[in-house]
């Protein structure tokens, strides 16, 4: 009998996408033997209202450039095509419709995002619709993640797993600040993405205010 499809969903603002995202997605794919990982650039992320997020077309194209060499990676425009704020619950429901009820979904998040899951829209429904994978991330204490995982497991059962991924202390915020200050971003993200940033003169203005 064929086994059910297992899909990883890697959500993010990807402003810009970097090696921290890619190494995390690949490590989780391997650990859970996922058939593929779908990167989903956020359209209008509700938690990032404090700063101007780069045009979604740029973020989508950079995500494509970064993932193109991995046969297991795909990019979905599901969230950037949606008007208004985008919520994970709506995205997962749409994927369920597309792939069928039997497909297992693993939503991949870094440790910082894990600490916020319970505040997400319809968190209880979401935790029943898909598994969550909490990837370690430099700067976020292991203990803190374990505590949060315990809390979630007590409420919802075995729906969340922790995966240790090769530590890369890279963030999009740091990359944007580097570009604004004229400092190098080489080796932090794939070269085509670096070229794209230069070509369209992204992040030239310091937006860290
Ligand atoms: P920003 O600094 O703008 O918040 P970011 O680097 O955190 O950007 P996001 O697009 O916010 O990137 O992250 C998408 C997902 O990837 C989140 O779940 C985040 O925790 C995870 N992630 C980002 N960078 C890393 C990293 N270096 N290691 C592990 N996980 C990461
Ligand atoms: Mg972030």
From Swiss-Prot:
SUPFAM superfamilies reported in the protein's UniProt record: Nucleotidylyl transferase
InterPro entries: Cyt_trans-like, NadD/NMNAT, Rossmann-like_a/b/a_fold
Pfam families per the UniProt record, alphabetical: CTP_transf_like
Transferase listed as a keyword: yes
Entry superkingdom: Bacteria
Pathway: Cofactor biosynthesis; NAD(+) biosynthesis; deamido-NAD(+) from nicotinate D-ribonucleotide: step 1/1
CDD domains per UniProt: NMNAT (cd02165)
Keyword hit for Zinc-finger: no
GO molecular function annotation: ATP binding; nicotinate-nucleotide adenylyltransferase activity
EC number in record: 2.7.7.18
Catalysed conversion reaction: nicotinate beta-D-ribonucleotide + ATP + H(+) = deamido-NAD(+) + diphosphate
General function of this protein: Catalyzes the reversible adenylation of nicotinate mononucleotide (NaMN) to nicotinic acid adenine dinucleotide (NaAD).
Name assigned to this protein: Probable nicotinate-nucleotide adenylyltransferase
Source organism of this protein record: Caldanaerobacter subterraneus subsp. tengcongensis (strain DSM 15242 / JCM 11007 / NBRC 100824 / MB4) (Thermoanaerobacter tengcongensis)
Gene this protein is translated from: nadD
